[in-house]
A protein has these predicted regions:
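DNA-contacting interfaces and partner/effector-binding or oligomerization modules
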Residues: 1-55, 59
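Short, charged, surface-exposed hinge/linker loops at domain edges
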Residues: 1-3, 41-99, 103-109, 114, ...
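DNA-binding alpha-helical recognition surfaces that contact promoter or target DNA
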Residues: 37, 103, 121
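Hydrophobic micro-packing sites on short alpha-helices
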Residues: 116-120
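Residue cluster at the C-terminal edge of the helix-turn-helix DNA-binding motif
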Residues: 122-129
């Protein structure tokens, strides 16, 4: 089974999903779960039409033998957790200023790879703390 990498971001009150496969496939939506469904439909349409145009598409892809690997940009990741995790809690475990986290959430700024890793590790740390509750 082939894994298709999909980059997900958040900007202008919408999630966006982009994958480069025999061109570019794009979908947008306000809701993350709906975005995934819309993207899957757009990808299937793209593959079908590309094959009709004579583009070389592997048989495994034409048969639907693929999965999507969604890689969330920090703007999308933070937006998903906005309202669930406070910026104060995330700031406490990451050491990143709440205001800066807000800029990342809104897509105003893009974190350096080290900052992204701090945020992901902070979310994991909070998750472990929640799991430790008996």
């Amino acid at each position: 089974m082939e894994s298709i990498k999909v980059l997900v971001g958040w900007e202008n009150k919408n999630y966006s999903a982009v994958a480069e496969y025999n061109g570019v496939v794009v979908a947008t939506h306000k809701d993350f779960e709906t975005l995934k469904k819309e993207f899957e439909d757009a990808f299937a349409f793209h593959i079908t039409e590309s094959a009709k145009d004579g583009d070389p598409i592997p048989a495994t892809i034409l048969e639907g033998n693929y999965s999507f690997e969604y890689e969330l940009q920090i703007s999308a990741l933070l937006h998903i957790f906005d309202g669930i995790l406070t910026r104060a809690a995330l700031s406490k475990v990451t050491g990143i200023n709440e205001r800066q986290l807000g800029h990342y959430t809104q897509g105003i700024r893009t974190p350096r790879p080290q900052q992204r890793e701090k945020i992901v590790q902070g979310i994991h740390q909070l998750g472990r703390q929640f799991l430790a509750v008996v």
